[in-house]
């Protein structure tokens, strides 16, 4: 297993797919990273040289990934809730934030139904 950004990435997969296993790196960003380092995206991680791995580590370090990104997202949501804006209120109440209908749908966001007692 190769370690990039503190994550063990699978060595038997292609570079782009293996990089996308890091939280915060999708396929398009993984392709951009491979292009910047000069690594073919269809090359497997186990076939990379140490210099190529170091280049990938340096390039990934330029982006917010894993714990830093999770912390940043949670702080953004907390800021919205502290402001008391519409989106913050929706987050606080556990309702859909982006304008979806809630009368008949949104069961995932609202949680299981509360049954009325007789």
Swiss-Prot record:
Signal peptide: none annotated. One of its GO terms (biological process) is translation. The keyword Cell division does not apply. GO terms for cellular component: cytosol; small ribosomal subunit. Residues 107-118 have a biased composition (Basic residues). Keywords: Ribonucleoprotein, Ribosomal protein, RNA-binding, rRNA-binding, tRNA-binding. PROSITE patterns: RIBOSOMAL_S13_1, RIBOSOMAL_S13_2. Residues 94-118 are annotated as: Disordered. One of its GO terms (molecular function) is structural constituent of ribosome. Belongs to the universal ribosomal protein uS13 family. Part of the 30S ribosomal subunit. Forms a loose heterodimer with protein S19. Forms two bridges to the 50S subunit in the 70S ribosome. PANTHER family: 30S RIBOSOMAL PROTEIN S13/40S RIBOSOMAL PROTEIN S18 (PTHR10871), SMALL RIBOSOMAL SUBUNIT PROTEIN US13M (PTHR10871:SF1). Located at the top of the head of the 30S subunit, it contacts several helices of the 16S rRNA. In the 70S ribosome it contacts the 23S rRNA (bridge B1a) and protein L5 of the 50S subunit (bridge B1b), connecting the 2 subunits; these bridges are implicated in subunit movement. Contacts the tRNAs in the A and P-sites. This is Small ribosomal subunit protein uS13. The gene is rpsM.
